[in-house]
Swiss-Prot record, chains A, B:
<dbReference type="InterPro" id="IPR006361">
    <property type="entry name" value="Uroporphyrinogen_deCO2ase_HemE"/>
</dbReference>
<keyword id="KW-0627">Porphyrin biosynthesis</keyword>
<feature type="binding site">
    <location>
        <begin position="25"/>
        <end position="29"/>
    </location>
    <ligand>
        <name>substrate</name>
    </ligand>
</feature>
<dbReference type="GO" id="GO:0005829">
    <property type="term" value="C:cytosol"/>
</dbReference>
<feature type="binding site">
    <location>
        <position position="74"/>
    </location>
    <ligand>
        <name>substrate</name>
    </ligand>
</feature>
<dbReference type="GO" id="GO:0004853">
    <property type="term" value="F:uroporphyrinogen decarboxylase activity"/>
</dbReference>
<comment type="subunit">
    <text>Homodimer.</text>
</comment>
<comment type="function">
    <text>Catalyzes the decarboxylation of four acetate groups of uroporphyrinogen-III to yield coproporphyrinogen-III.</text>
</comment>
<keyword id="KW-0210">Decarboxylase</keyword>
<keyword id="KW-0963">Cytoplasm</keyword>
<comment type="pathway">
    <text>Porphyrin-containing compound metabolism; protoporphyrin-IX biosynthesis; coproporphyrinogen-III from 5-aminolevulinate: step 4/4.</text>
</comment>
<dbReference type="Pfam" id="PF01208">
    <property type="entry name" value="URO-D"/>
</dbReference>
<comment type="similarity">
    <text>Belongs to the uroporphyrinogen decarboxylase family.</text>
</comment>
<dbReference type="InterPro" id="IPR000257">
    <property type="entry name" value="Uroporphyrinogen_deCOase"/>
</dbReference>
<feature type="binding site">
    <location>
        <position position="206"/>
    </location>
    <ligand>
        <name>substrate</name>
    </ligand>
</feature>
<dbReference type="InterPro" id="IPR038071">
    <property type="entry name" value="UROD/MetE-like_sf"/>
</dbReference>
<dbReference type="GO" id="GO:0006782">
    <property type="term" value="P:protoporphyrinogen IX biosynthetic process"/>
</dbReference>
Length: 351, 351
């Protein structure tokens, strides 16, 4: 049914003619076409207006030729749906009020009806699927519980996660109660996204690397596993990608959540990751996003290196080319276009 | 000659009766005694006034009972000595002017006479050694070339290192020219610190984890090796610690610089690091600094875990207990004191 299903085939580790590519934050500020829409509307309104969210979701498919679309939204819509007031000033910072720091604060958070409180995301997915007309798959996503927990407890972004860690270390039961509550919403939310038409799900654990291995095992991984298993129980054919950025020492345990793909930051050579994980999951990544500041020759050389480091494909292997984190707002779109075209061409030799 | 030489013995992997402990930023804002001095003087003036630098350097030795002192200073004194204007507002941010972005900018930077431009650090070391009166060893330090390069090129702190990476990817020769110039000063500077009395040297590569493995191999490691070898050539008995925070995938290559100890962030279980490195270097680290926000029981449990994870000592092993990064300014000093006392007592069972 999909005209280009390479992305899903790679996630399922089925034979592909070449490596598919999409990039995190591909619907974003680096595109003048995105900025034109943002001039007329603020960030959260854009997330909440399905027609506009659909439009910016499809922009990189049409303008850049990526092999997958990802629904335009923000991980913090989950916090908002649970009853927090969320302010996002895209260039400046994030504020959530009130910060969640006591049992009473946790009790006040609701477990919302996803169809009700996050219906606008589901509407945007349905509309995008329709307009995409099966050109490429559509990715749904959520932040992971630990990352959303840090925003809730800190009341915004954070350097050292002081309040989040204080709760974990002084009131671990309370921390788990909040994490469980968030995780329950995430599970419902990602399943509802699949129901609305999302072809794959990515769980973003952006602040994963702030935790020690054991803290990650206690406060992050079990919830990710819960979310992955929630999707798998209802939709066994829908691939799930877990992106626990820079958790390079516990890749194997991330794969053990039952996900189909492990997303990598650029801190590890993808060859090493493949050596550790074998071909039991697909790997997604992992070029340094700042390489897109480089010359065309440098961009091609670095992309070629990622493909070469991943190496030859087998009947069980899967690789989705991506950056190791989001594309930066001041990148020249021509450089992304060049990357996409180069990866499409160059990767064929490894398949 | 030293009354307590455990820190140096651990770095040299000689038998110790227990594990020595110091913590990064131990002379700092969490101590009311430090804040009392800072109320009367700004940060850089404190660095440049040997009597005051000596006083805050010794505070944690007397108040906390740590097994080593580290000279109070800042990594950016090297940038300043090379001709940049450096402003440090401890709670707000760092500004270096002008940012170094062209060949002409690089040419204008000087390779200073360390005795002249950084004489105040050497004076502070001499004075501190005298007043310490051999109670514990004194650590000298420098930022690594890559980290100082990012400050120079960005003109301050940075989130994505856009300008630094642009130079690396578009003008790699120019980047290497700047890195070489900085590295030459670092080598002179750390040797001068030893000459003035420093008993060990630590190289801080604070922003190490912003680089891919290959970029780290090209733009960071060779300069660290140059600095380590500069010390070793002149002072073979003086231990050098390399702290390339969160470079957990290339620990073995860090050890190959010829350093005596590898500093670890808290992102890797120290047992894994020891498995990778064997006992060919001492390991320094690696408790999450935010554990000091925890209850006394939690602090002891986590410290005990680091010691247990490191495991039993052999005739060739070395472990210096430390946090995985600097102690945070809002930590209760009583919690550090508790940690120091606990590590001293608990660690004996592993020796």
């Amino acid at each position: 049914m999909l005209k280009n299903d390479l992305f899903l085939r790679a996630l399922k580790r089925q034979p592909c003619s070449r490596t598919p590519i999409w990039v995190m934050r591909q619907a974003g500020r680096y595109l003048p076409e995105y900025r034109a829409i943002r001039e007329k509307t603020d960030f959260l309104t854009l997330c909440k207006t399905p027609e506009l969210a659909m439009e910016v979701t499809i922009q990189p498919v049409e303008l850049m030729g990526v092999d997958a679309a990802i629904i335009f939204s923000d991980i913090l819509v989950v916090n908002e749906a649970m009853g927090m007031d969320v302010e996002i000033i895209e260039t400046k910072g994030i504020k959530l009020t009130p910060p969640i720091r006591s049992q009473a604060d946790i009790n006040r958070l609701i477990i919302p009806e996803v169809q009700d409180k996050l219906g606008y995301v589901l509407d945007a997915i349905r509309l995008t699927k329709k307009v995409l007309d099966n050109r490429v798959p559509l990715i749904g996503f959520s932040g992971a519980a630990w990352t959303l927990f840090t925003y809730a407890v800190e009341g915004g972004g954070s350097k050292n996660y002081a309040f989040a860690k204080k709760m974990m270390y002084r009131e671990p039961k309370m921390a788990h109660m909040l994490l469980s509550k968030i995780s329950a919403v995430i599970s419902e939310y990602v399943c509802a996204q699949v129901e609305a038409g999302a072809d794959a799900i990515q769980i973003f654990d952006s602040w994963a690397s702030a935790l020690s291995e054991d803290d990650y095992r206690e406060f992050a991984l079990p919830y990710i596993k819960e979310n992955v298993q929630a999707v798998k129980a209802k939709y066994p054919d829908v691939p799930v990608i877990v992106f626990s950025k820079d958790c390079n020492t516990i890749l194997s345990e991330i794969a053990d959540t039952g996900c189909d793909a492990v997303g990598l930051g650029w801190g590890i050579d993808i060859k090493k990751a493949r050596t550790i994980l074998g071909d039991r999951v697909c790997l997604q990544g992992n070029m340094d996003p700042t390489v897109l500041y480089g010359t065309p020759e440098k961009i091609k050389a670095e992309a070629a290196k990622v493909l070469r480091q991943f190496g030859q494909h087998t009947a069980q292997s899967g690789h989705v080319f991506n950056l190791g984190h989001g594309i930066l707002p001041d990148v020249d779109p021509a450089n992304l276009k060049l990357l996409v075209e180069f990866v499409k061409e160059e990767s064929a030799k490894y398949h």
